[in-house]
Amino acid sequence: MKVTYQDLLEKMTNMEMLAIPPEKGEMGGNFSSYDRNSSYDPSTDTYSQWGANRDCDGYIRMEKDRLVAFEMEGPGVIWRIWSANPQEGHIRIYTENEQKEKMDMPFRKLFERYAYDESRVEWPANFPELMPILSRGRNRFIPIPFNHYCKVTLDPGWGEFYHITYTKFPSCVELPEYSLDMEIEVQTALAVLDRKFYLRGKEAYEANQLENTLVENLTLNCEAGEQKILYQSDKPLAISGIWLLADEKQCAWEDLEKLRMEIYWDGEKEKSVSCSLASFFGVIKESCEYRSWPVSKTERECAAFWYMPCKSCLLYTS
């Protein structure tokens, strides 16, 4: 099965794909700098030094003076690289069992520039949403695919802390070959994705106004101890968004915490969702307004854009 780079970018925002079970052999995970003194012994089901907290410089092994941060057989893709404190030591990425690295650049610049090496002039990426600085942590959400093998090394002086998030695909999947030229070739597609991330929450709302989407507007008053049907359907459908608009000035956490959402799918007797509205919309007592891809909150409105297909459904609030 051939997967294009555009297909990989689509996976980063398409909520419908979350409702499709992964293929046999597909798995996701993360390589990080966690303290290797922490370990688990499956033979005794015990943890050793689980409180070890030197999480800034762990690695798989050393190769001369470079640490190996990531190593995996393909096919797979690196989705995200993060560091709390990237510095000038180089990151090197090797793919497809090649001896020469596909990427060789200062770790800090990985979060600011297109990938480059000695043969290529530095080029600012200008992707504030694909390369955001969050709580001083640096992020890079630009996929790096590989078919047979991938290794990431870090030179001395690289900094502290890293995450490398990945998906490993079944052997039948064929991915595009990563190169420095690829990032330049797909810059328009990356710019479109960057804009999508900027419009997170807003774009999902607009997508749910399309012709093939039915929007139900409901007004409910729910007294203490009362249970009301929020929505019911005996026909196959997919819920793609749920909004809550408060009739008061603010959508207060205290009110959301008192109300519960319960969802039954396909005639089930046991509810599949049972939580407070605060939990459903990702709201805590101290939360301010925010917009993420699946959920968002403004002063008066909460929204969730989880894609939920079913043969029939019954939604209660109480």
Language-model features: locations:
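Solvent-exposed, flexible loop/coil segments flanking beta-strands in beta-rich domains
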Residues: 1-89, 159-255
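A cross-kingdom feature marking solvent-exposed beta-strand/loop segments within repeated
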Residues: 65, 104-144, 273-307
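Short, surface-exposed beta-strand/strand-loop-strand elements in extracellular ectodomains
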Residues: 90-98, 254, 258-265
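Juxtamembrane membrane-water interface segments of multi-pass membrane proteins
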Residues: 141-143, 248-255, 262, 305-309
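Short, conserved beta-strand segments of beta-strand-rich sandwich/propeller modules, principally
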Residues: 149-151
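Short beta-strand-plus-loop segments that form exposed binding edges in beta-rich domains
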Residues: 154-157
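Conserved small/polar residues in nucleotide/adenosyl-binding loops
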Residues: 316-317
